[in-house]
């Protein structure tokens, strides 16, 4: 007798049980796997950590939180936050503006130094930030590259890369292997362009 797979959010193991039992039609396999991923993703706890000097990255962090449903209590200014707080999250959205020749926002230095000492295996990390590609094309949003490179050895998984075609002529360190490593909001771009990029980034992160 055929049994129907559970729709109660039992997770990946329930789907695998029915797949291996041979009772789920082949055409349903992809949809069921996607459903499991969606259920698992939306049970993940998300934290936003940002560094902001002029308020632009703070505003961007608030906009991302509103768009993704992240609670205000889970939005942290790294000037006041502890890296220990990051350990309580499954998905970290990390944001910084870029200063000087591709440098981090000031409050990020101590926070990143502490964060890169944490074991972040199993956590997902997505990057966002603000910059000016017209004035600083070779270091546009390079603070994101600083964060990524600093966390490479922590065991985290980076998500949220965008197609480099979104940023025509990108020459900074955020452009790698045909991808841009995160959401780079350009001071010179229109609000419509920035919003469209944010939507693509949110989708790439997995929301």
Predicted features and spans:
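Polybasic, lysine-rich low-complexity intrinsically disordered segments
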Residues: 4, 17-18, 29
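FMN-binding flavodoxin-like domain, especially the glycine-rich phosphate-binding loop
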Residues: 59, 67, 71-76, 88-207
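Short acidic loop-to-helix transition motifs that present clustered carboxylates
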Residues: 77-82
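Residue-identity detector for glycine
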Residues: 8-11, 22, 27
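N-terminal beta1-alpha1 ligand-phosphate binding loop
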Residues: 45-64
């Amino acid at each position: 007798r055929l049994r129907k797979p559970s729709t109660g959010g039992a997770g990946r193991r329930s789907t695998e049980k029915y797949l291996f039992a041979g009772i789920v039609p082949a055409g349903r396999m992809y949809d069921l796997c996607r459903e499991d991923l969606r259920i698992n993703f939306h049970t993940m706890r998300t934290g936003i950590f940002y560094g902001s000097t002029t308020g632009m990255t703070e505003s961007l962090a608030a906009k991302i939180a509103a768009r993704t449903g992240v609670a205000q209590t889970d939005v942290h200014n790294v000037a006041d936050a502890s890296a220990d707080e990051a350990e309580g999250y499954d998905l970290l959205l990390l944001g910084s503006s870029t200063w000087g020749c591709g440098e981090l926002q000031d409050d990020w230095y101590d926070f990143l130094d502490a964060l890169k000492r944490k074991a972040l295996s199993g956590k997902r990390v997505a990057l966002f930030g603000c910059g000016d590609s017209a004035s600083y094309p070779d270091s546009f949003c390079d603070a994101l590259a600083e964060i990524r490179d600093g966390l490479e050895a922590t065991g985290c998984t980076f998500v949220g890369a965008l197609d480099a075609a979104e940023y025509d002529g990108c020459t900074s360190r955020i452009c790698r292997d045909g991808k841009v490593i995160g959401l780079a909001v350009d001071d010179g771009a229109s609000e419509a362009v920035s919003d469209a990029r944010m939507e693509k980034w949110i989708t790439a992160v997995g929301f």
